[in-house]
Amino acid sequence: MKIRLNYRLVILLVFLALLAFREVALELRPSFLRPGLHLCAYVDNTADGTVTAIDLVKLAPVATISVGADPTGIRANPARKEIWGLSSAGGYAWVLDVTTNRIVARIPVGAAPYALDFSPDGSRAYVAASGANTVVAIDCASRRVVAHGRAGRRPWIARVTPDGKLLLVSNRDDATVSLLDPVTLAPRGVIPVAPDPEQIAILPDSSKAFLTSGTTDQISVVDLTRRVLLANLALGGTPDDLILKPDGGELYIPSAGTHGLVVVDTQTDEVGDFLLLGSSPSDAALTADAQVLFVSDFAGGHIVPVAIGVRQVAKPISVGQGPQTCELTPGGDMLLVVDTQSDDLGVIRANEPTPSLVTLVPTGSHPRDLAIKLF
């Protein structure tokens, strides 16, 4: 009788363990993810020229794909089951089919490309070649270059306005932004901005653009209707990222130089609130309802949640070493953080009153950028 009771106890414990495991798995599975749908993250690894594909339900790597030397600029095509990226050393764009985790195209784009953007409908990709001072437009269906254009010296990124009517290119060595026709890449104007312009944020109504300076404490405000520079705003430290509120009303700018977050009113073009966050805030991700901004602190090794509406800083969340790029999954269930120095992807349960780290998923060597795809 005693042996039978022990067996029953073992069976009961195993059953409870399996039940608990199932509950945890269900808890981590996003509510919108129906059977047959997949949710994956793709992380480019700069030191080994690969991309790590990570299943966000299993929270485990499922493939390592060779893409070429110095991968950068990884983006999810909004209209196709594809991840696009660049080989800066190879001078080409690569296309990854997410259903097979195989590279299906390599498209020459010019020397030293760093960033890639899509048209609003996902039909075209735009790449600026920093080493050739050129811009190309790629038809995403045929995967062929369909237009060439000239940029200024050492262009960084080509960004399309939300209305699809202009292509903006930041030219670092010229301290200008080029305006091009997004179909033909014919020139439409050149506007002077602050030194070494890099990142670009554009208001939802396509009326203004904001550009970071890579070497000063300024951001430039450009009127896209009149095509003139409105102002160069001093922030107190070099801007590291541009996060635009969905309604376009505010711009959030992490700055390692100020150890904090600068808020800019995009209607008045004035620097507003400042929040002290940590050692070296760099990148950020904003929830869809614009209530919480998650800011990565590279030197501190954590993520700082900010209740942005009330300007309240919450307790930091420890992740891996050198957290930088961060992005929320569709639905906002998880925040993914690329840990550049510990070679992993931090997964944070973001939709709780107190967000917490779930796990660290291994990546390749020296990960940099991140893309998320639901398919």
Predicted regions and their residues:
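Predominantly soluble domains enriched in secretory-pathway, periplasmic, or organellar proteins
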Residues: 2-375
